[in-house]
Amino acid sequence: MPRYAIYLIAVVCCLVGCRQKQPSFRVPAQAPPYAGLTAILVKTDTLWVEIVSDPASRAQGLMYRRELPKDEGMLFVFEYPQLLSFWMRNTYLPLDIAFVSPDRRIENILPMKPLDEGPRYESRGPALYAIEANQGWFARHGIKAGDSIQL
């Protein structure tokens, strides 16, 4: 009997030792779609944004782009709170813009028409940030004025 017990223990040890190990790394819950994007939380939803904070990048914005993936957008960062005004010159995409106060609350959200150089889309009050996303993104996620963002 002891001889069989030794063989049994040896077989069990071999089987345990041959077991495939699980990888030691974990895939992040939300990996960025591609380099250069940052996740921001708008209310409770993630939007991947390209951040533009210098005058030339802010002036360029999303001009000339033909597509914007589903949960992506652009975050405009300004030096100080001010009344902001945007237009859609050379912008082919229908967008929504959310103006965000210094305390990171959405002041107002406006739909913007592609290639429309006429109207200016303006913040209701002094804003430090503006977020552009595909038209309807804010509404689909139940986001409205007064909701907060986390950077």
Enumerate the predicted regions with their spans.
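C-terminal motif of bacterial Sec signal peptides marking the signal peptidase cleavage site
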Residues: 14-17
